[in-house]
């Protein structure tokens, strides 16, 4: 049985946090990393690793979203949208050629602190495959050619409930004083901030850049918003997204760390279940809703909250969570 809903206040907090960004398990055995090539100096591999790990920390985050150029005569670009928050980024695991970083929002509302598990980014060195978005409700494991994976890292972004969002492959570069990773063009579903408006576009084709900077890092997105409803995708409008992570000690990270300590076992089991589905089906089918994202999002987040509140045991939460994913991913 799925756990009953949280009080309306907590549900609103979950949905608000999920809408902040164009967001945020290990990859299955089918997506194994290859060991560092003998042709790549060990120091280069380690330099990449340290650049990835440098994204962990405690931050104030600023989100800037701006539609710039319309390619549809009937579409006017939206006004700039600004938001922000406090977010910690913690290392879930570091296995050398596989690194996982979990983002957790720590929000203050008057006297109350609300913690929400946010997106997650997984990095794999020289991946054999990557999880990619195929269209409404569907993701698949896409092979990566030997040429494309040589010296490269995949980054897979997972949503708040550890369901997939998008994945891409790229290389870290260190030119012009910048430590920067740049992805290949990647398809992704609409962020909730767009989906709730029922816009003419229904997907993004984006290029991601993760760039280290003094006192933090920045996530740059160059998104072409596309409509695929009439067949082949057609460009509607180009958007820039700038998510800036600035190191901060102006708030206590403890509520976020307490949440993660209480729920990380549950989320490890949830990641394993998503892995199981990926391996079983060669991808993931899961329905999406405009306001809440994948249909698994709200019930899984509520289960984690009930676990932290002591209203359900970890074993029971895991059993219910696995059942939620199983039902949602069966056509």
Predicted segments — roles?
Residues 77-79, 83-93, 102-104, 120-121, ...:
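Hydrophobic/aromatic beta-strand elements that line small-molecule binding cavities or substrate pockets
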Residues 28-54, 66-80, 95-102, 107-110, ...:
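Amphipathic/hydrophobic helical signal segments and adjacent flexible N-terminal regions
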Residues 11-21:
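N-terminal export leaders
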Residues 150-205, 225:
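Short helix-loop boundary/capping segments
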Residues 19-30:
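Hydrophobic h-region of N-terminal signal peptides that target proteins for export
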């Amino acid at each position: 049985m799925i756990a009953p809903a949280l009080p309306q206040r907590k549900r609103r907090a979950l949905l608000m946090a999920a809408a902040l960004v164009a967001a945020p398990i290990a990859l299955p055995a089918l997506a194994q990393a290859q060991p560092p090539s003998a042709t790549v100096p060990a120091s280069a591999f380690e330099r990449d690793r340290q650049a990835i790990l440098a994204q962990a920390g405690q931050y104030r985050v600023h989100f800037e979203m701006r539609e710039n150029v319309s390619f549809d005569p009937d579409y006017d670009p939206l006004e700039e949208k600004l938001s922000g928050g406090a977010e910690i980024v913690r290392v879930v695991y570091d296995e050398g050629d596989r690194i996982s970083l979990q983002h957790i929002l720590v929000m203050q509302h008057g006297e109350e602190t609300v913690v929400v598990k946010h997106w997650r980014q997984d990095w794999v060195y020289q991946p054999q495959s990557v999880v990619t978005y195929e269209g409404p409700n569907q993701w698949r494991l896409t092979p990566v050619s030997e040429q494309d994976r040589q010296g490269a890292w995949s980054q897979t972004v997972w949503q708040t409930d550890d369901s997939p969002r998008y994945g891409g492959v790229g290389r870290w570069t260190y030119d012009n004083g910048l430590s920067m990773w740049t992805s290949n063009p990647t398809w992704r579903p609409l962020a909730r901030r767009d989906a709730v408006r029922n816009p003419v576009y229904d997907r993004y084709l984006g290029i991601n850049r993760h760039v280290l900077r003094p006192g933090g890092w920045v996530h740059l997105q160059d998104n072409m918003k596309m409509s695929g409803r009439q067949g082949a995708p057609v460009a509607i409008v180009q958007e820039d997204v700038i998510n800036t992570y600035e190191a901060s000690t102006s708030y206590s990270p403890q509520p976020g760390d307490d949440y993660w300590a209480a729920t990380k076992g549950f989320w490890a089991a949830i990641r394993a279940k998503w892995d199981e589905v990926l391996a079983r089906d060669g991808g993931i089918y899961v329905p999406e809703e405009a306001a809440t994202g994948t249909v698994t999002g709200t019930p899984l987040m509520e289960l984690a909250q009930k676990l932290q509140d002591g209203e359900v045991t970890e074993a029971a939460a895991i059993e219910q969570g696995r059942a939620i994913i199983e039902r949602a991913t069966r056509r």
